[in-house]
Structures are given as structure tokens and as C-alpha cells.
Amino acid sequence: MAPLSSSTREVFSEAVRAVLETWPVLQIAVDNGFGGAFSQQKAEWMVDALQQYFTDNGDLQPDEVEDFISELMNNEFDTVVDDGSLPQVAQQVCGMFQQCEQGRLAEVREQILKLNQKKTSSGRAKATPAQTPQDDDDDDEEEAMDCEGGSAGASVSSTAVNDLHHEEEEDDGWTVVRRKK
């Protein structure tokens, strides 16, 4: 394998960046801080590390690249990738590297352009738990019931909760009976 020229290395580095920036697993890890306070810097470093891995090693197979990326994700982001996307990412990066080696830079640039368009049109994914309005109502009722129990550690005054229930119950036509303390 002949060493890549600086312009070819630059195109390959852009290709790696485009692939990783459109990979949802890495973006979720970065957006949610799985790598700590420096998650974004780790993702940028990962581009350089992967590009250097190809430069330092000859004739890499997709499974070797897959193992390397998996190790980086585990070490840097405490993330085990098991969604099936890792082989696709490795295959894509290997394919682009082979195209760069063969001097087919126009094809690689076209793929980079498509990936960048995909990135801007789809936005970034964010892993947040969804809460339905029904769940929210249940939580409020449970909190109110906990406060009414008169536990010594309650931080909400039971009179405020009782007043709230008093108003609700009076609207329904019921009479409120309170016990003495």
C-alpha cells in the first residue's frame, strides 16, 4: 500500500467525519454526554484516530475496523453498540478508504456531500424518556396521597394539600371531614 497524499488524506478524513457525524449511536452518545464533559472533543478525536488507524495499518478488513470502532465507543463513551449499525459504519469507512486509495476522490466527495445533506435534513437524535399526560396525572395523585399520610419527613404542608383537595371535593358536592391533629 502506497502512503496517501496529503490531499487524499484530507478527503478521507472528511469522509470519516461525515460518516461518524451521521451515525446516530455516536451522536446520541455525544448529545447525552456519555463521554463526560468532553464528549464532543472525544468525537472529534475519534475521527482523527480512525483516520490514523487506516494510515498506520495496511489492508484493513471491515471486521477489524468494526472492532476498533467498538473499542473506541466502549472506552471513550462507555457505550456498547448492539443495534447492528457498527458493521455498516465499518463497511462504509472501508469502502471510502479503498476509493481514496484508487484515486476516486470525486466519488468520495459525492458521498460526503450526500452524508452532509442527510445530516442537515435529519437533525440530531436525542435519547429522552417520553412521559404521557396520563403518567403525569398519576404521579401528582401519588404525591398528594403521600403528603396526606402525615409523615414526619414530608416537605409539603398537609394543609396546602388538604386545601387543594377541599376545593376539588366541594366543587363535586361532597362535604370534607378533617381529623384533628
Curated annotation (Swiss-Prot):
Residues 118-133 have a biased composition (Polar residues). Belongs to the TSR2 family. Keywords: rRNA processing. This is Pre-rRNA-processing protein TSR2 homolog. It comes from Danio rerio. Residues 134-146 have a biased composition (Acidic residues). It holds the Pfam family WGG. Residues 118-181 are annotated as: Disordered. One of its GO terms (biological process) is maturation of SSU-rRNA from tricistronic rRNA transcript (SSU-rRNA, 5.8S rRNA, LSU-rRNA). GO terms for cellular component: nucleus.
